[in-house]
Amino acid sequence: MKLNEIRDNEGATKARMRVGRGIGSGKGKTGGRGVKGQKARSGVSIKGFEGGQMPLHRRLPKRGFNNIHAHDLNEVNLGRVQQAVDAGKLDANAAVTVEALVKAGIISRARDGVKLLGVGELTSKLSFEVTRASKSAIEAVEKAGGSVTTTFAAGVAHRGAAEGAVASA
């Protein structure tokens, strides 16, 4: 047996029916599409239409909502900040702000601020000025001898400040 000799078993596949090739074929003229109407034309299928049966997207219940007041925060882990300090991208003596994080390349753009998370090891004594911080992050920073100050500015103010930091880089 060779790869080019592999075939389906006899009768395992049904021959393709060519439609619209004369009335003698049994699938001529309208080609199994019925008569006239949108569904008889080419290229038209009605998305989500299940032949009059209640479609899936209407059978399932609605869930949840989108909170228009939610803050879109960048999440930054302590380990990532420590890597930037070790690489010389962040000044360990200056305050770690949103602008400094953008300039160091830790976050690509400031959204509505930054939330500091406690994943990773922090060995440098740093002072953070962020929008929010988790309990584990605050404990880790204070254990390393640093401090965390939470400040909130409107998203537009953060974005403007961060863009200024990138422009001056």
Curated annotation (Swiss-Prot):
Biased composition, class Gly residues, residue ranges: 21-35
GO molecular function, one term: structural constituent of ribosome
Region named Disordered: 20-56
One annotated Gene Ontology cellular component of this protein: cytosolic large ribosomal subunit
SUPFAM superfamilies from the UniProt entry: Ribosomal proteins L15p and L18e
GO biological processes: translation
UniProt keywords, alphabetically: Ribonucleoprotein, Ribosomal protein, RNA-binding, rRNA-binding
Pfam families: Ribosomal_L27A
InterPro entries: Ribosomal_uL15 (IPR030878), Ribosomal_uL15/eL18 (IPR021131), Ribosomal_uL15/eL18_sf (IPR036227), Ribosomal_uL15_bac-type (IPR005749), Ribosomal_uL15_CS (IPR001196)
Subunit structure: Part of the 50S ribosomal subunit.
Family recorded in the similarity comment: Belongs to the universal ribosomal protein uL15 family.
Protein role: Binds to the 23S rRNA.
Name of the molecule in the record: Large ribosomal subunit protein uL15
